[in-house]
């Protein structure tokens, strides 16, 4: 019996040793940060850029392509992820205020978010792939999708009518090299 307990203790010690680096790198249960940067554009070829502290989608001419915002993506579950603006401490969020649901950028470092916190749910989007395109549904407000307007240079927003022709909810992503 004593030998069996020792074996179990040694096995536990070995497992803890083997996974120590994983737990040491991510104390307090924080998830590993596997952040990747992506270029993003809608199916009408509009890219994201900042104008007057607002994220908008439009057609950038070659001389202005450096204004294009790249999106940082941090996966937290197979299809759930956090989205932020690359190189900035701004995250995409879905906020409910009364009966109103709106998109906003919040001054938050994407690597500080934790999937286990209810207050971070507004930053969580569910990715749905359909062939080469991707849609992003809010986890905090199911049925609401990240979208762009058909017209250029309009703010990025959310819609609960993803099939309406006046809103675009399908995006292309390309990993930034």
Curated annotation (Swiss-Prot):
A GO CC term assigned to this protein in UniProt: extracellular space
Protein name: Interleukin-1 receptor antagonist protein
InterPro entries, A to Z: IL-1_CS, IL-1_fam, IL-1RA/IL-36, IL1/FGF
UniProt lineage: Eukaryota, Metazoa, Chordata, Craniata, Vertebrata
Organism encoding this protein: Equus caballus (Horse)
A single MF term (Gene Ontology): cytokine activity
PANTHER family per UniProt: INTERLEUKIN-1 FAMILY MEMBER, INTERLEUKIN-1 RECEPTOR ANTAGONIST PROTEIN
Glycosylation, residue list: 109
Key word Secreted present: yes
Function summary: Anti-inflammatory antagonist of interleukin-1 family of proinflammatory cytokines such as interleukin-1beta/IL1B and interleukin-1alpha/IL1A. Protects from immune dysregulation and uncontrolled systemic inflammation triggered by IL1 for a range of innate stimulatory agents such as pathogens.
Keywords: Disulfide bond, Glycoprotein, Secreted, Signal
